[in-house]
Amino acid sequence: MKKYSLFLLCLMAAISLHAQSFADYFADKTLRVDYIFTGNAAKQEICLDGLSCLPSWAGRKHHLSELPLQGNGQIIMRDAANGSVIYKTSFSSLFQEWLETDEAKAVTKGFENTFLLPYPLRPAEIEITLLDPRRNVRASMKHTVSPDDILIHQKGTAHITPHKYLLQSGNTAKCIDVAILAEGYTPEEMPVFYEDAAIACESLFAHEPFRSMKKHFNIVAVASPSEDSGVSVPRLGEWKRTAFSSHFSTFYSDRYLTTSRVKSIHDALAGIPYEHIIILANTEEYGGGGIYNSYTLTTAHHSMFRPVVVHEFGHSFGGLADEYFYDNDVMTDTYPLDVEPWEQNISTRIDFISKWEDMLAQGTPVPTPSSESGTYPVGVYEGAGYSAKGIYRPADNCRMRTNEYPTFCPVCQRAICRVIEFYTE
C-alpha cells in the first residue's frame, strides 16, 4: 500500500509539472540571449555577450520542457528557486561546424550566436551546452537571469524594420512565425526583394508537408536594407557592405554562403514576431546554407533558387541532414560511424529502430540497392551525410539530396510534420 501511495504521489507530481501553464513561469515577452562561442579544436568556451527584452513571445507555449530534436547543442532554463526545468530548446551552430575544419586546429576564433527564450517572471538559471559529433559535452556554462535586471536592453519598441506579411494564417501565439530578410538589397531594390520573398514562400508551400500544413504558418518579409547591392564573393575579390555581412566561401567552400554576424540579423527583426529565419541574398552566384534553429541563407537570383531555399529550410527548420555525398569529400568524417546521428533522415544503423525502420515494407533488402528504388520508395540506401559508406538515407533521391528531385521523401516529410506538430499542437 505504501509503495502504491508513493507511486501515486510521484505520478501526480509528474502530471502537475507537465500541466503547468506558460503563464505560471513566463511573461508574454522574449528574452534574447547573445553568446560568443569561442575556441579551437582542442578547447571551447561559451561567453555571455548580452541580454535583451523583446515586446512579445512568438514561440511555443506548450511542450515547454521537451525537445523536438536533440540538435548539436541545447539550452535548459530552470526556475532558480527550486531547480525545476521550465523550458528547453536545441540548436546547431556555425562554430561547431568550423571546429571540424583544419583551420580550427591552428587558430582560435569566436562566433556570435543568439537564442530566443520566453521571458521569465522570476529569476531563472540558464544552462547552455555544446555537444561534439560523439554526443559528448564540448562546452557548457550556467548563468542566472533576473527579470528586473536594469541592464537587460529593451528592444523592438521603435525603429522597427519595414515589413509586410506574405501569409498570415492566425495569431502569432498559435502559428509558426517565419521571417524572410533581405541581404544585399539596397533601399531602391526592395520591390525586387518582396518579389523574391514571395517566390521563396510559394516554393516552400509547393512541398509536402508544408503544403497541407500551411494553415500553421505566418510568413513576414522584412526589408532590411544594405549599402551595396549584392553579397561578398571572396574568390572573385568582391566584398560588399551589406546588412548581415554574408559571404560565399565559408570554410573555403565556394558555394557555402553564411554570415557570422548573427546579432545584426536579430537586431533587424526586433519588434517583429518571429521564430525561424530565411535570408535571401541578392546574387546570381549559386550557394546557400542552413543551420538548425539558426537561419537559412540562400541566393535569390540563381536558376536553382526555388529548390535550394526549400532544401536549406529543411536544415534550419526541420533539422534534416544532407543526404548527398561525394568521393573524397572534405566533410566525409562529419558523422562517426559508431554513433547514431540525431537527424531523422540519416542513419548509421546503430539505433535504426529510432529512425524509419517502421516505414520499411516487409521484405525490403537492407542495404537497399539503388537499382530497386522503384520497388522500394522507402529503403536503406547507402551513402548520405557526405559519406559514401556507412551512413544510410531513406530514399534513393529526395529534396535533401539533389536540386532536381521535386519532393521530400516520405521519411523527411514525416520528420518535418512531427516538428510542425510539436510547435503547434
Language-model segment annotations:
Residues 15-19:
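Sec/Tat signal peptide C-region and signal peptidase I cleavage site
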Residues 25-151:
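Beta-strand-enriched, solvent-exposed domains that form extended recognition/catalytic surfaces
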Residues 190-193, 288-312:
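Short pre-active-site segment immediately N-terminal to the catalytic Zn-binding motif
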Residues 313-329:
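Catalytic Zn2+-binding segment of zinc metalloproteases
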Residues 216-292:
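Active-site-proximal segments of metallohydrolase catalytic domains
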